[in-house]
């Protein structure tokens, strides 16, 4: 049985890591050992931040809704409670989008919510 040298597989493995580290600064983009650490760290950040992204966007939507609702003399918590009472099933993403881009429709929803809260 012939002897298997590891040069080809090692080269392929190194190329894969160096390719993933493309665009990094300093020795992180061309020194295998450092690039490998940088790529692993980048993967950890990417994994963590894919989850954080959901929290950050929800917080942004809530902030936008709160700001828009306060222009109509209402607080965010009262507004959300009123949405439930009026059985309006719009999520925060859609509400925030309406608050920014379709103020008339958002104002109509606020009026419905005020009626539901008063009743």
UniProtKB/Swiss-Prot annotation:
Keywords carried by this UniProt record: Ribonucleoprotein, Ribosomal protein, RNA-binding, rRNA-binding
**InterPro entries in the cross-refs:** Ribosomal_bL20, RIBOSOMAL_L20_CS, Ribosomal_protein_bL20_C
Record-annotated membrane-spanning stretches: none
Q: What's an example GO cellular component term for this entry?
A: ribosome
GO biological process entries: ribosomal large subunit assembly; translation
User: Quick check: keyword Ribosomal protein in the entry?
Assistant: yes
Q: One GO MF term, please?
A: rRNA binding
Superkingdom of the organism of origin:
Bacteria
Q: Which Gene3D superfamilies match?
A: 6.10.160.10, Ribosomal protein L20
Entry's NCBIfam families? Answer: rplT_bact
What is this protein's function per UniProt? Answer: Binds directly to 23S ribosomal RNA and is necessary for the in vitro assembly process of the 50S ribosomal subunit. It is not involved in the protein synthesizing functions of that subunit.
Family per similarity comment: Belongs to the bacterial ribosomal protein bL20 family.
Q: What is this protein called?
A: Large ribosomal subunit protein bL20
Q: Which organism is it from?
A: Paraburkholderia xenovorans (strain LB400)
Q: Which lineage do the record's taxonomy fields give for this organism?
A: Bacteria, Pseudomonadati, Pseudomonadota, Betaproteobacteria, Burkholderiales
